[in-house]
Amino acid sequence: MKINSIIIGAPSSSSGKTTISIGIMRALSRRLRVQPFKVGPDYIDPGYHNIATGRFSSNLDTWMSSREKMKEIFIKRSTGSDISIIEGVMGLYDGKQPDKDTGSTAEVARTLKSPVIIVIDISAMARTAAAIILGLIKMDKRLRISGVILNNAGSDYHCSIVRTAIEKYTGIPVIGCVKRSDDLKIDDRYLGLKTAMEDDNSGKIDKIADIIERSVDLDLLIKISKESGDISFKSGLFSKKNVNRVRIAIAYDAAFNFYYYDNIEMLKMYGAEIVYFSPLNDYKLPEADGLYIGGGFPELFAERLSDNYSIKKDIMEFFNSGRPVFAECGGYMYLSRGIKINGKYYEMASIINGESYMDSLILGYRNIRAESNNILMMGGWHVKGHEFHYSRLNVNANAYKTERGPDGISTKNLLAGYMHLYFPSNPRIPERFVRSCYNV
């Protein structure tokens, strides 16, 4: 199958990939059906993709799943779109290992046979940009680097001299030059960009798209996307049929929005109806057979979460009824007795007998093994995932074993921990969660 696609890569992080990507996505969405993707385990950038295109963004990660599963996700999500835009991660060749590009943007580009557009920040360089692009080309000649977008240019003249150098020494066309502008800035914080749900970002994305339309040859970009190669897959990840009809309530608001889209889609595949609720704004849980509270920034909304006694009471009653409750990272914090922040203490849902507090960053891919049977996994099952947080929770962890040690809490109807599990790495997990919800 041939899918028109573009991968947007860069020599390094902080080159402007996300800003340029969401601008291209929104600009193209004004005339085409655009399917967005994000390379790697990130949960924040896909939120901007969703707003930019009106379609949910999926993660493409060869370490957390496999090349075959990734191709299946890519083909399934791209069906019905005119073009797929894939935002890369870090530098083009940066992955999990120093001597291999596993999990990198380059590996994804090769696997999907997608042309690559390089975004390069030229704010502090001119002719040297050509040397950088030349190095990226020579590092792996199996890649199809088909265009360059210059970012953070100081003037039209700056654009002109860098364009001339790159096209002379590499033969690769410069398809756009974006000059520095305050309208291109997206606020960030310690875990990366602010989440797309924290502010009204649609207007901001429109301004970025307006700049992209003036600065990038989108017709040429569309033409390049049609150079994508044929791909097929042998996975069968989404070939399962409905198992049981259940309803799962998922927390989704400004405090909790770190989810892998394909996790939710796999729950649906096994028979779950998904209903959403807000621990910030709602006073009652919807009727449901299971509860899923994902990651996010509960520490930024601690006072509001603490003050919403009604929803906390409802969650406690739900848990005490014996129905399954699954929580990841920020959701894990929310289910604790409380969160300590800057000397203040905020009461949370009090399902877990422990308190959370802020500390140094913990970040990385994780191989995860269940220590015993729980609502999602049998003891000994493995799953891959990602850990990304600044908090700690003072409990005797007993749910998972990882390279860093134990994590999480597991009881008869509760599974909660810092790990963000990636269901496509073990499709038995969403099936078991649905069965757990059905069998209460």
From Swiss-Prot:
Domain named GATase cobBQ-type: residues: 247-428
EC number: 6.3.5.11
This protein's name: Cobyrinate a,c-diamide synthase
Family: Belongs to the CobB/CbiA family.
Pathway: Cofactor biosynthesis; adenosylcobalamin biosynthesis; cob(II)yrinate a,c-diamide from sirohydrochlorin (anaerobic route): step 10/10
CDD domains: CobB_N, GATase1_CobB
Site residues by UniProt (Increases nucleophilicity of active site Cys): H420
Principal EC category: ligase
UniProt KW keywords: ATP-binding, Cobalamin biosynthesis, Glutamine amidotransferase, Ligase, Magnesium, Nucleotide-binding
NCBIfam families, A to Z: cobB (TIGR00379), PRK01077.1 (NF002204)
Species annotation: Picrophilus torridus (strain ATCC 700027 / DSM 9790 / JCM 10055 / NBRC 100828 / KAW 2/3)
Keyword Lyase: no
Known cofactor(s): Mg(2+)
Disulfide pattern: none
Keyword 4Fe-4S: no
